[in-house]
Regions:
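Short loop/edge segments at beta-strand edges and connector loops
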Residues: 85, 172-174
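N-terminal lobe of the biotin/lipoate ligase/transferase fold
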Residues: 2-163
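Solvent-exposed beta-strand sheet faces enriched in polar/charged residues
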Residues: 47-49, 173, 192
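Long, positively charged amphipathic alpha-helical accessory segments at protein N-termini or as interdomain linkers
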Residues: 1-27, 37, 41-42, 143-146, ...
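Short connector loops at helix/strand junctions that flank enzyme active sites
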Residues: 103, 127-131, 173, 184, ...
Length: 251
């Protein structure tokens, strides 16, 4: 319900009465008040005015299940979000979801990874509160030999999402990177799958986007960049996640 109430607040330019929210979601005023208090604790600025109702004043760069689900307007890509404040790897968690029978389009997101994965066993720097670490679970009806094409589709979706949200021009560096116009890495993609000879059980596509990161390790600082460094200002991560998922569904 929190995601739905947050979506309603974002869609309104004026105050929403508590009674209106109660009737729409068939809950009590106390339940609505509790949701508003939870949102305030998460950093949302919400005005509550007697005889007028509630109004969303400002949304911070919050990474949460409710925030992401309130922004995504797809039919299946990212409609179900599994969120971790901290985990080892979103690809690992997404593969667990795949083994448990999670639905096509399930999106696993973390605010921090302790063992982020790159290609060829490399690690992916994943500090807290700065960037996007997410993996989408897919159950495509294609032959395993065609699975690598899905990496390219995600790369296209990511470039489109970045341009839509920020206006920044970037490019795809085959097979799995997105780079700035100066050639520095903004984003990496890792695709893994569980398959038989002629059948895919599931595919997981992990994507890491350097969004608001300003410092990189000595090892990669000469070849890595972030949207914040390129633009000169910070970007709301949840908004970018939604844009990438919407572009991916259309690919």
């Amino acid at each position: 319900m929190k995601s739905e109430i947050l979506r309603l607040l974002k869609s309104s330019d004026t105050y929403l009465s508590g009674q209106q929210i109660c009737e729409q979601f068939q809950v009590s005023r106390t339940a609505v008040w509790k949701v508003m208090e939870q949102l305030k604790k998460e950093g949302y600025q919400i005005e509550a005015v007697r005889n007028k109702g509630y109004r969303l004043v400002d949304s911070p760069d919050v990474m949460s299940k409710a925030e992401i689900e309130s922004l995504i307007s797809t039919k299946w890509a990212g409609r179900h979000v599994v969120y971790y404040g901290e985990t080892d790897s979103t690809n690992t968690r997404a593969k667990e979801q795949g083994e448990r029978g999670a639905e096509h389009g399930t999106l696993v997101i973390a605010d921090k990874q302790n063992a982020g994965k790159g290609r060829r066993g490399r690690s992916w720097e994943s500090p807290q509160g700065t960037s996007i670490y997410m993996t989408i679970l897919l159950r495509p009806g294609i032959m395993p030999v065609k699975a690598p094409q899905m990496t390219l589709l995600m790369a296209i979706a990511a470039t489109q999402g970045i341009r839509r949200v920020t206006g920044l021009e970037d490019g795809i560096k085959w097979p799995n990177d997105i780079v700035s116009l100066t050639g520095k890495k903004l984003c990496g993609i890792l695709t893994e799958m569980s398959a038989e000879i002629d059948y895919i059980n599931y595919v997981v596509i992990g994507i890491g986007v350097n969004v608001n990161q300003e410092l990189f390790s000595q090892e990669i600082k000469e070849r890595a960049t972030s949207l914040c460094l390129e633009l000169g200002h910070k970007v709301q991560r949840s908004q970018l996640i939604a844009a990438i998922m919407e572009s991916f569904e259309k690919c």
